Amino acid sequence: MSGSYSPQKDPQHPTQHQQFPPTPPYPSSSVWSGNLGENPVFIGIGSAAGASALTLLGVMGYRRYWKRIKNADYVTSELLRRRAWIKGIVTSVGDGDNLRLYHTPGPFFRYPFKIRSIPTTQKGLRNETISIRIAGVDAPENAHFGNPAQPHAKESLEWLRATILGKRMRCQLLAKDQYNRIVAVPYISRRLWWDRPLPLMMLKEGMAVVYKAGGAEYGPWGLDEMLKVEAEARDAKRGLWALRKFESPGDFKARMKLKSDVSEERPEKKSPSGWIALVKRLIRRT
């Protein structure tokens, strides 16, 4: 027989002499989990995720708890919707039922962490305070817009100034009125005891009456409780209830408005001029 027989190699059926590249071993899950802490890629991803989470939490915390509200324009609908609480210092009292509050969020306005201060000049406070309308009460009207002051307006204003000016207060934000004031329930802060609710204090001392106009807010007590406190002051003749003739602030404002409307509608009497005026002067002399 000429030549030797050599079988053809079938790639689909390798013989024992054929060898393929070895398959790389796959690590088990235990190996992966055991090496994650040493893998620089996973360390980098974890560090970046942690830093991002801390940054996000910091921004959210700052916006919710430490960002200062400069004035009523910065009070958002979201703050009013959730009836947020703020704290601050009363910088001025312009009427018997409103105040201006300098918002002091966070721990940095009080010792031992005090690193921020409150302006003391009118220039420094301009556009930096929140105009607060005390919810649920109505104090006697001061003189303004050409109208006279209502009886007991001075006493109510002086009492409110002596009670809260320069004091630290907590306020629950409720709404914004047509004058861009924030309707809120203010409490006088006390470190060692319960905070004092200012609206109830005003009613109890006879410095205001319950506000009953449309859209009124009565805080956590409700209208019935506030009317009860008002009735107790009336029976004891405290404050404005000691007046011999009392007119509610609402009735007073309505009367002043009616008076103003009538005066605007009344035509002005024109002084006579020319020969008519001359004749009248001659008649008066005779």
Curated annotation (Swiss-Prot):
InterPro entries in the record: SNase_OB-fold_sf (IPR035437), Staphylococal_nuclease_OB-fold (IPR016071)
UniProt organism field: Cryptococcus gattii serotype B (strain WM276 / ATCC MYA-4071)
PANTHER family per record: EBNA2 BINDING PROTEIN P100, SERINE_THREONINE-PROTEIN KINASE 31
Topological type in the membrane: Single-pass membrane protein
All residue ranges annotated as the TNase-like domain in the record: 84-243
Region (Disordered): 1-29
SUPFAM superfamilies, A to Z: Staphylococcal nuclease (SSF50199)
Transmembrane segments: 41-61
Name of protein: Probable endonuclease LCL3
